[in-house]
């Protein structure tokens, strides 16, 4: 109904306004800290406003937790008629538990298949620490199959626009959406 749509739009605008206010306060704080460091002011007056803004309500990422639904998702991925690169990314994701950007940007040089591990360099990680991902037998099988398609390139999942860059994390998400899993049901994060 039209009333419901307007209520949802109003809620989204309010959430965006709160988010914008928090970002503006953060920017002001950075400006004042720079001004202090360069001798232009003595204190950060933006710090006085911390706690004055309504907190941003963070919503948990949607995920499937029901075992039967997880099984259905995995079957849908196996049956998905995407190209082999996208399908491999979707198939590998449940075995490695990394962020979509880390998966999409994975490079062959980061993998030691004999040791069954993926060593994600610190500069690629959100916390800037080396992250070692153990690889299961199933993950190794997916990687061996994938090597036929992208083993000659830098990236496991090269972009369809050229091998010199990886596919985007949005590409993985778009594949889930095409399979019918919208953002309220499943995210790749």
What are these regions (language model features)?
Residues 2-27, 37-106, 114, 125-129, ...:
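Basic, Lys/Arg- and aromatic-enriched nucleic-acid-binding interface segment
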Residues 31-35, 143-146:
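Hydrophobic recognition helices of helix-based DNA-binding modules
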Residues 32, 90, 173:
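Short glycine-/small-residue-rich flexible loop motifs, especially phosphate/cofactor-binding loops
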Residues 59, 63, 125-145, 153-176, ...:
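C-terminal catalytic core of Y-nucleophile DNA break-rejoin enzymes
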Residues 71, 75, 87, 101-105, ...:
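Feature representing long, continuous alpha-helical segments
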Residues 105-111, 188-189:
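A short, basic/aromatic helix-end/turn motif that makes direct DNA contacts
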Residues 121:
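Active-site-proximal binding-pocket segments
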């Amino acid at each position: 109904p039209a009333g419901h749509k307007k209520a949802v739009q109003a809620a989204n605008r309010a959430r965006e306004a709160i988010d914008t206010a928090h970002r503006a306060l953060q920017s002001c704080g950075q400006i004042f800290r720079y001004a202090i460091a360069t001798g232009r002011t003595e204190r950060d007056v933006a710090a006085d406003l911390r706690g004055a803004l309504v907190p941003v309500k963070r919503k948990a990422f949607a995920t499937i937790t029901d075992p039967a639904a997880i099984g259905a998702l995995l079957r849908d991925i196996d049956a998905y008629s995407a190209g082999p690169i996208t399908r491999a990314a979707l198939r590998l994701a449940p075995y490695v538990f990394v962020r979509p950007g880390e998966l999409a940007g994975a490079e062959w040089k980061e993998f030691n298949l004999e040791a069954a591990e993926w060593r994600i360099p610190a500069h690629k990680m959100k916390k800037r620490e080396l992250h070692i991902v153990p690889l299961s037998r199933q993950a190794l099988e997916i990687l061996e199959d994938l090597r036929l398609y992208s083993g000659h390139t830098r990236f496991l999942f090269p972009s369809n626009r050229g091998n010199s860059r990886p596919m985007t994390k949005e590409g993985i998400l778009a594949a889930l959406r095409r399979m019918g899993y919208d953002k309220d049901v499943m995210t790749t994060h």
